[in-house]
Amino acid sequence: MIHVRHTLAEVARVIVGLVFVGSGLLKAVDPVGTALKISQYLAPILSPASAGAETITLALSFVLCGSEFLLGAFLLMGVYRKFCARLSVLFMLVMTAVTLYTLIANPISDCGCFGDAIQLTHLESFLKNVVLLPLSILVLRDARALRHLYSRRERWVPAVLSVVGIIYFMAENYRHLPYIDFRPYAVGTNLREAIAKEEASLQRVLLGATKYIYSKDGKTKAFEASALPDSTWTFVEARQEADLASYKPRYDFNPIDSLGEPVISTLLDSEGITLLLLSPSWRTASQAVLDEISELHEEASRLGYPFYGVTASTSEEIAQWRYLTGASYPMLQLDATPIRTIIRSQPGLVVLRDGKIIDKRAYADFPSVEGVSTYLRSLPQMQPHGPSATRTYLLWAWAALQLLAFLRFWARKLHLTVHLHIKKRLHLTK
């Protein structure tokens, strides 16, 4: 019976640990996105426009992503077992309560449990926590009996490496752009084709959901768009038989110019290179790269590349930005939400080639003043590229740490088994 209980605890430890590691990593990939999700949760008590709100939510994002990953990692490695088991139960109690609240009140669209990688409904998120909570209690009940991959003397080494590693990983994803972009505007996306496909799909849904009511000889009948009656019938009305109010397009990219005219066709149908400098608000945009932005605009103009600023700022904020930076490029208006979805940096650069996103850069990665010309001249041949090698090496290093620990664990177990077998044989010989 005790053996079965310990086995269940071990299985529960692995499940809870893997979920925590996966959830923590998927959120740590995009700490700014996690901060935006936290701000939605805290909106009733902390207005996103209030002073310090962005700093508070970003700090909470780092704490949430880091603690969730570390809890899972420590559980998998079997270090600080009792402490981590208690924290995991506390964590699951809080998360279960939060997901129950979202299930009842529906304050946000999705829970954000796995970042933008996996979007669960409120019910799915709540059921996930209902399963994980008793599993974490199982782990707590037999915490001291759990197998460990590192001894008491050794455990501080993987613990410190894990803490330093996840902090560095999150900092890099914040300073640059997310390690993996799970959003609709990832590098390599052909916006021209993707938006056209979505619009065509919506039109099919609208046509299928619309019934056309005609009358003839005192009788009325509903027809579909593909099978309308002849001219002897009289049109009465069109009815929408499906509720499309909850429909949310995947692509919400429809900027307008200073006259209020849509310019999406101009941007996406243009052949060649188009540069977009985006920021939800010029008031909060970093001023650390003003010289680089000016050089980008001037060199782009010399090469004939269209260059636009895209923002949700007020006219006063735009005027202030022009005064501070000398910006003469045209400004386009777009809601702050799609801007934050497109790029997590303030400001950030998006490069389109024939309607396809070929590069995205946080302001920390803007080319230097001296390197602007080389960068812009490389764009016609540039191929979409992945994240920096540093973060890739970091993830491989952590995976290697786990593999080494498991190999050491099984080597010790094999050594002990062989030792006991030899001892038993010697005893029988005597």
Place the predicted regions along the sequence by residue.
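Alpha-helical transmembrane segments
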Residues: 73, 133-145, 401-417
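Hydrophobic alpha-helical segments
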Residues: 3, 7, 12-13, 19-20, ...
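Juxtamembrane/start-of-transmembrane alpha-helix segments at the extracytoplasmic/lumenal side
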Residues: 129, 151-153, 382-400
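Juxtamembrane interface at the cytosolic side of transmembrane helices
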Residues: 84, 286-291, 390, 400-430
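Internal/C-terminal transmembrane anchor helices
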Residues: 150-178
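Soluble extramembrane regions of membrane proteins in the secretory/endomembrane system
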Residues: 250-386
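Membrane-interface segments at or immediately adjacent to transmembrane helices
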Residues: 168-264
